[in-house]
């Protein structure tokens, strides 16, 4: 194995020991979340009636650009007035009413002035599919922005035939300082709910024969790394002797991806009942899923492999593998012998095996009361002329379930976290994405159109405060 990777993993493992003893976040109570009101910010809704908004970027034209997952629309918004224009609508985007598919990734070329490219990923019909339950594919595509006509043209499919389902699409796309595309693709919801008996592929990588045949089914549960033309970088890691688009493996639903000023890649990832993760992405790293959720600590999670169950009529007890129906093979995290495991920088949240996953406060929507917060993206705050005091080296992580945005402080090298995740902006909203203005004193936040969120009293509501909105939070300097 690469000596550089070994050194990084050793460092992260040492950090994990510190994290477990000092920085392992304890789940907050609803009353604690209710206090996260952030009085030092003025709130203003500048745009509403969006249809499943997903990605949010500050454009090279100093305007806000955002996407609608349901419609395939790419919108440009004036950050002051909220006036909006539809720049383009990606044709033939597939979005199921009950699915996480649609228009997903969105990024500008770093040198947009000389290379006016916009990169997207999305769900499209797969003409080669013979599976009625899985008829779609994910495509990573490049468009050229035409300034004269103010629209997108000349589509080029960089990578087609990627896995797609209704669940765990992830779909965050960023371009790194190395001029490579980084893309998160989830495990497609395998081993749970509608896909309970489908084998999870997060630990699998392609053979050379599969890669040559453009069979990408093992790309589920990965972070991919592509050249800007979609080809495989020569310096990508080798897995079982094969160099593919895969950069890291062992992911569940990594919906957040962001580079730091010093070139490190941070990621937020949704866990099962417990252990949402904040990760530092390391070349060739294995992040454990589905064998490990969070730390390799045998705490609150075990891998129940329903695809190996003989009886395909049994039900998931929704106990995070700690309790399962008879006949389901279960392995503890400590029993997993996978190589190159990279522990998270932080979890939200880790609990013991005795934790009650059936809190009656949430009624039938018990998943809302689970320790997880459902992190939906990640944004590295870079400050500016009006930077918020004390926010240096900060990662912002929106939550879908808790109606907050977490502020996570990291050390100056972005290698470890300093303190607990601090919740802010509590409301009955499902926060989807967040960015800051170039000056650093204004945050812009997208909210989901629909869904469930936990109220201040701990119960569940689907009546959202600002559904499908772009909200402006302006810092009031003391």
Swiss-Prot record:
List of residues binding Ca(2+) 3: 293, 295, 297, 333
NCBIfam families found in the cross-reference section: non_repeat_PQQ (TIGR03606)
Source organism superkingdom: Bacteria
Gene3D superfamilies: TolB, C-terminal domain
Active site: 168 (proton acceptor)
Residues given in the record as pyrroloquinoline quinone binding sites: 367, 372, 401
Protein name: Quinoprotein glucose dehydrogenase B
Binding of Ca(2+) 2, residues: 277, 287
Remaining remarks: Acinetobacter calcoaceticus contains two different PQQ dependent enzymes with GDH activity. GDH-A prefers 2-deoxyglucose as substrate, the specific substrates for GDH-B are disaccharides.
Quaternary data: Homodimer.
Record InterPro entries: 6-blade_b-propeller_TolB-like (IPR011042), Glc/Sorbosone_DH (IPR012938), Quinoprot_gluc/sorb_DH_b-prop (IPR011041), SndH-like (IPR019893)
Catalysis performed (reactions): a ubiquinone + D-glucose = D-glucono-1,5-lactone + a ubiquinol
Signal peptide boundaries: 1-24
Pfam families to which the protein is assigned, alphabetical: GSDH
Family of the protein in this entry: Belongs to the PQQ oxidoreductase GdhB family.
Function: Oxidizes glucose to gluconolactone.
């Amino acid at each position: 194995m690469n000596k550089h990777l070994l050194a990084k993993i050793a460092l992260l493992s040492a950090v994990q020991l510190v994290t477990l003893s000092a920085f392992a976040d304890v789940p907050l109570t609803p009353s604690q979340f209710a206090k996260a009101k952030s009085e030092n910010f003025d709130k203003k809704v500048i745009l509403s009636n969006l249809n499943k908004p997903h990605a949010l970027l500050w454009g090279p034209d100093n305007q806000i650009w955002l996407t609608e997952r349901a419609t395939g629309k790419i919108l440009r918004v004036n950050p002051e007035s909220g006036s909006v224009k539809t720049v383009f609508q990606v044709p033939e985007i597939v979005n199921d009413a009950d699915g996480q598919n649609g228009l997903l990734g969105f990024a500008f070329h770093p040198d947009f002035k000389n290379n006016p490219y916009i990169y997207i990923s999305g769900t499209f019909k797969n003409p080669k599919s013979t599976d009625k339950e899985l008829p779609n594919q994910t495509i990573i595509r490049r468009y050229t922005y035409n300034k004269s006509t103010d629209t997108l043209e000349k589509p080029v499919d960089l990578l087609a035939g990627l896995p797609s389902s209704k669940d765990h699409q992830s779909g965050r796309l960023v371009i790194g300082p190395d001029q490579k595309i980084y893309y998160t693709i989830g495990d497609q919801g395998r081993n749970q709910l509608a896909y309970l008996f489908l084998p999870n592929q997060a630990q699998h990588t392609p053979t050379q024969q599969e890669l040559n045949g453009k069979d990408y089914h093992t790309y589920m549960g990965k972070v991919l790394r592509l050249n800007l033309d979609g080809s495989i970088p020569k310096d990508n890691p080798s897995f079982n002797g094969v160099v593919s688009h895969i950069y890291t493996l062992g992911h569940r639903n990594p919906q957040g991806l962001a580079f730091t000023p010093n070139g490190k890649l941070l990621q937020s990832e949704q866990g099962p009942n417990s252990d949402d993760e904040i990760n530092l992405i390391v070349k060739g790293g294995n992040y454990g899923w589905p064998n490990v959720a969070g730390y390799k600590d045998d705490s609150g999670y075990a891998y129940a492999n329903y695809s190996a169950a003989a009886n395909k009529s049994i039900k998931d007890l929704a106990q995070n593998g700690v309790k399962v129906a008879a006949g389901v093979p279960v392995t503890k995290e400590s029993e997993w012998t996978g190589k190159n495991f990279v522990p998270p920088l932080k979890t939200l949240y880790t609990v013991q095996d005795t934790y009650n996953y059936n809190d009656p406060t949430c009624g039938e929507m018990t998943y809302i009361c689970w320790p997880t917060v459902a992190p939906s993206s990640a944004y590295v705050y870079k400050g500016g002329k009006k930077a918020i005091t004390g926010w240096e080296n900060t990662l912002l992580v929106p939550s879908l379930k808790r109606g907050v945005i977490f502020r996570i402080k990291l050390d100056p090298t972005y290698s470890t976290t300093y303190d607990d995740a601090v919740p802010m902006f509590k409301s009955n909203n499902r926060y989807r994405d967040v960015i800051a203005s170039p000056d650093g004193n204004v945050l812009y936040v997208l909210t989901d159109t629909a869904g469930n969120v936990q109220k201040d009293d701990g119960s569940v509501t689907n009546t959202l405060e600002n559904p499908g909105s772009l909200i402006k939070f302006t810092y009031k300097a003391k």
